[in-house]
Amino acid sequence: YTGIIADSGRFLYDNTTTATLGAASFLYDCGIDRNKIHELLYRRPLNIVQAQGFVLSQFEVSEAGVAYFKMSKDVQDSYGLTTGTRSALVNTLANIEGIRVWVCFFENEDGRIRANIRSNGPIINEVAARFEGGGHPKASGAIVKAWDDCQALLDELEQVCHTYVKELN
């Protein structure tokens, strides 16, 4: 059940099917403690909530709906984040009106920048593949060599969003 909830985003993501819901229903009927699982999955440590505050105060968004934030290694350290725990910040910008694509830029130990890219519509994995990355159509990752290189990734995502909007109309 935990995997189903996490992978389907609490049944919000496109990968949720009748089979997904059926499996969850079966597990519920087997007596799982759904409330305890949800509490363990979604309760946030204070440092993560504080880091989310940083994200919400620092992110920028373009006219086409590409949002991003940059988090240096020093800032990550100030919030006690690790490579593993910083993933809790990836969906901070997920449900903000007008944002189609969002990118979380995290400086790694080696100075390269990890870009976690997510989408509410446009296909992003092809862009990620051009930046030493890849992934799923709406959830991908990439690597840029330095902070100055982030703009090239953002520019490509901006184009993807413009194309997406044209195709919708």
Can you say where each PLM-predicted feature lies in the sequence?
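Hydrophobic helix-and-loop "lid/oligomerization" segment in the mid-to-C-terminal part
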Residues: 8-130, 135-169
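Active-site histidine-anchored catalytic micro-motif
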Residues: 2
